[in-house]
């Protein structure tokens, strides 16, 4: 799984893009492979000056790699910094980013100031 995703990323980067769009890039990867892919993506983004637009439901990836987040709620897009989104009072956003599954990531992000 991880090698296939890395090969797909390499093919996309061969075109020397300024914008990279990824759809669920860590889906199907075990946690260690997903973390390695996130690290690779962050390194490439920094080294190549890429703008990355990513669709993901992976909270690990969101908290590790994103500096801005967009969420579609009630057929409308809302976006902000990660900290701003996690403070949004909408019940779905609160449940998603502060629910049982998300608690440890939110606490980690708060500690890191992201």
Where do the language-model regions lie?
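Catalytic Walker B motif of ABC-type/P-loop ATPase nucleotide-binding domains
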Residues: 20-23
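Helix N-cap at the start of a conserved alpha-helix in ABC-type nucleotide-binding domains
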Residues: 31-33
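H-loop/switch region of ABC-family ATPase nucleotide-binding domains
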Residues: 56-57
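A short, surface-exposed alpha-helical micro-motif characterized by mixed small hydrophobic
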Residues: 62-64
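C-terminal boundary and immediately downstream tail of ABC-type ATPase nucleotide-binding domains
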Residues: 83-114
């Amino acid at each position: 799984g991880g090698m296939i995703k890395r090969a797909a990323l390499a093919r996309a980067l061969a075109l020397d893009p300024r914008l990279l769009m990824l759809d669920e890039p860590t889906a199907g990867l075990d946690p260690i492979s997903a973390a390695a892919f996130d690290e690779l993506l962050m390194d490439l983004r920094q080294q190549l000056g890429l703008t990355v637009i990513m669709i993901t439901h992976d909270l690990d990836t969101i908290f590790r790699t994103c500096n801005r987040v967009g969420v579609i709620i009630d057929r409308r897009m809302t976006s902000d910094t990660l900290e701003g989104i996690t403070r949004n009072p909408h019940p779905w956003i609160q449940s998603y980013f502060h629910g049982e599954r998300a608690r440890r990531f939110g606490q980690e992000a708060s500690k890191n100031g992201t």
